[in-house]
UniProtKB/Swiss-Prot annotation:
Entry keywords, A to Z: Ribonucleoprotein, Ribosomal protein
Lineage: superkingdom: Bacteria
NCBIfam families with a match to the protein in the record: PRK00132.1
Record keyword Ribosomal protein present: yes
Organism of origin: Methylocella silvestris (strain DSM 15510 / CIP 108128 / LMG 27833 / NCIMB 13906 / BL2)
GO MF annotation list: RNA binding; structural constituent of ribosome
Phylogenetic classification of the source organism: Bacteria, Pseudomonadati, Pseudomonadota, Alphaproteobacteria, Hyphomicrobiales
Family as reported in the entry's similarity comment: Belongs to the universal ribosomal protein uS9 family.
GO cellular component, one term: cytosolic small ribosomal subunit
Descriptive protein name: Small ribosomal subunit protein uS9
GO BP annotations listed: translation
Length: 159
């Protein structure tokens, strides 16, 4: 049987799909009210805890200015907070191991981004658009036998 509709509004309401609510994300906090996440980059692994505060950053028990002396590394570290407009709103406690300073800074950035999303799930879209939630999978290529390095061959002599 064909239904009869007296107006366009009736037709619209009959054919409209049921609206779905946006998924509701929940904060993931520990007993001290901190969000935790792990970040990785090259060989470095960073464990990051964040809690609301004044913007104090402690890396391996030292101030961030001492541990990451180069300003570029500190800038990499602060990028997620800058994009999310949350500079000086969170205290960070970080333990990082493995790799060099550049890889460690990248690992902290990755972990901080994930911890921010755990604390404020609505920041996920902003941080994902900037690429901070994506693990940078580039690692050092292994050395092959018969070669000097991963790709460089030994010097060749014709005679």
């Amino acid at each position: 049987m064909a239904e009869t509709f007296s107006s366009l509004q009736d037709l619209k309401s009959a054919t409209a799909a049921p609206t779905q609510e946006a998924p509701h994300y929940v904060q993931k906090l520990d007993a001290q009210g901190r969000a935790y996440a792990t970040g990785k980059r090259k060989d470095a692994v960073a464990r990051v805890w964040i809690k609301p505060g004044s913007g104090k950053v402690v890396v391996n028990g030292r101030a961030v200015e001492v541990y990451f002396a180069r300003p570029v590394l500190r800038m990499i570290l602060q990028q997620p907070l800058g994009v999310a407009k949350r500079v000086d709103q969170y205290d960070l406690t970080v333990t990082v191991a493995g790799g060099g300073l550049s890889g460690q800074a990248g690992a902290v950035r990755h972990g901080l981004s994930k911890a921010l999303v755990a604390f404020e799930p609505e920041l996920r879209g902003v941080l994902k658009k900037e690429g901070f939630l994506t693990r940078d999978s580039r690692v050092v290529e292994r050395k092959k036998y018969g070669k000097k390095k991963a790709r460089r061959s030994f010097q060749f002599s014709k005679r």
